[in-house]
Curated annotation (Swiss-Prot):
One of its GO terms (molecular function) is histidine phosphotransfer kinase activity. Keywords: Acetylation, Cytokinin signaling pathway, Cytoplasm, Nucleus, Phosphoprotein, Stress response, Two-component regulatory system. It comes from Arabidopsis thaliana. PANTHER family: HISTIDINE-CONTAINING PHOSPHOTRANSFER PROTEIN 1, PHOSPHORELAY INTERMEDIATE PROTEIN YPD1. This is Histidine-containing phosphotransfer protein 1. It is found in: Cytoplasm, Cytosol; Nucleus. SUPFAM superfamilies: Histidine-containing phosphotransfer domain, HPT domain. The lineage of its organism: Eukaryota, Viridiplantae, Streptophyta, Embryophyta, Tracheophyta. Two-component system major event consists of a His-to-Asp phosphorelay between a sensor histidine kinase (HK) and a response regulator (RR). In plants, the His-to-Asp phosphorelay involves an additional intermediate named Histidine-containing phosphotransfer protein (HPt). This multistep phosphorelay consists of a His-Asp-His-Asp sequential transfer of a phosphate group between first a His and an Asp of the HK protein, followed by the transfer to a conserved His of the HPt protein and finally the transfer to an Asp in the receiver domain of the RR protein.
Amino acid sequence: MDLVQKQKSLQDYTKSLFLEGILDSQFLQLQQLQDESNPDFVSQVVTLFFQDSDRILNDLSLSLDQQVVDFKKVDPHVHQLKGSSSSIGAQRVKNACVVFRSFCEQQNVEACHRCLQQVKQEYYLVKNRLETLFKLEQQIVASGGMIPAVELGF
């Protein structure tokens, strides 16, 4: 695949992430903060999000598996995950966290377990898709190209 095809492929792939609701405009704002002085800014921020999210999801699993669930511990974790996913534009993770928090407020253990599975599913989806996006970007840079701006236009 030549450079122009790689760039077009990246643009199409990125658009699909927005069309599927996986990412929202916050991700574009994050990309705008990246420049020549810090070319890995977005991938660094997203990597930190992945590390924090893995820890939070593990903590949530442990908390919900307790004999007596302490929702005063569960809710702050969900709130933190909602905030961090919102800050990188991981829209579907954020939306799943909103539902999760409502069940925390109701102290509905069964529904919280289902929500945790949904959050994990959305998280692993966005993680996989962003890792693919970054690989495409790396291939373009390795070929001597520039990362093209994405015009969503929808």
